[in-house]
């Protein structure tokens, strides 16, 4: 009887070990795979290589998610504005109506504001149903969680250099044009990683588009790959690959992230750290909407104040 129990335990441990190892697998080859129109099976196989993949995504969501339609129908709903120059301790988002947010982004002289983390906006406007009905081709097998986001940006603005921990991570351009700069996980040691467990964000303090003097030596040790995406193109970025999105034109990006049951188990320590962080940290965002009463001023500067 004891032998049988020990054997069952061994099989369970072996099963978990193999699946967790598979989930945490990385690939450091600095190249991107381009496919015209992959089948569902081909996409799954190639994604498991853990290399970036670029392909065309012909889907109705491309004709629905654009500035004109959202401005006409959902301009009163709040999106979240982020100052990408803020440090970890002030990593919060400012809610503004879509109309106000677009004005801010358009007139931001310093190009330091972007819009992301807009799950609430998608839910309140019911646009999340469009995402949910358009991503069956992208969803991996045994998916446990789907995370959707909407990113907005104007020319010359860009996101932080960061990575994601989920099993699948796709970015679809539905309007405009962007450049994505990528580097594989092996370069993490040169990127001065900042972990914000409260929102599960893992970003580099290095500005990959305008490298600070103090990081020049580290930057010279890494190699990056730039890829341009236009409307209708989608890219898969593997977990732990650093990426930054720079907007060439006024653009909207749909972000699809997926976690499977085994992926959730593999990154369980990150969720535990998030619980601890949220229990020990209390932050309050002050109401500063009055700061943008004159959005067309020469120099727009919104501060994220935390008490």
What are these regions (language model features)?
Residues 1-234, 242-307:
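N-terminal accessory scaffold of Fe(II)-dependent oxygenases
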């Amino acid at each position: 009887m004891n032998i049988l129990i020990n054997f069952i335990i061994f099989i369970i441990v072996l099963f978990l070990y193999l699946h967790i190892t598979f989930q945490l697998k990385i690939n450091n080859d600095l190249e991107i795979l381009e496919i015209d129109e992959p089948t569902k099976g081909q996409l799954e196989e190639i994604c498991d290589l853990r290399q970036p993949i670029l392909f065309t995504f012909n889907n109705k969501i491309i004709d629905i998610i654009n500035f004109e339609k959202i401005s006409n129908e959902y301009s009163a709903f709040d999106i979240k504005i982020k100052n990408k120059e803020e440090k970890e301790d002030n990593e919060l988002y400012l809610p503004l109506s879509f109309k106000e947010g677009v004005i801010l982004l358009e007139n931001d002289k310093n190009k330091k504001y972007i819009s992301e983390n807009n799950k609430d906006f998608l839910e309140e406007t019911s646009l999340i149903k469009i995402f949910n009905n358009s991503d069956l081709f992208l969803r991996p097998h045994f998916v446990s969680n789907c995370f959707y986001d909407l990113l907005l940006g104007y020319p010359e603005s860009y996101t932080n250099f960061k990575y994601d921990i989920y099993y699948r991570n796709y970015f679809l351009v539905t309007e405009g044009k962007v450049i994505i700069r990528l580097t594989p996980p092996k370069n993490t040691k040169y990127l001065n990683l900042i972990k914000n467990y409260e929102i599960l964000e893992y970003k580099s303090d290095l500005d990959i588009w305008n490298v600070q003097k103090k990081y020049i030596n580290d930057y010279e040790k890494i190699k990056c790959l730039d890829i341009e995406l236009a409307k209708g193109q989608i890219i898969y970025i593997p977990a732990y690959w650093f990426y930054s999105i720079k907007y060439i034109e006024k653009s909207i990006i749909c972000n699809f992230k997926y976690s499977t049951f085994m992926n959730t188990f593999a990154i369980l320590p990150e969720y535990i750290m998030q619980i601890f962080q949220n229990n020990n940290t209390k932050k309050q965002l002050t109401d500063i909407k009055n700061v943008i009463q004159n959005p067309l001023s020469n120099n727009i500067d919104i501060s994220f104040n935390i008490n």
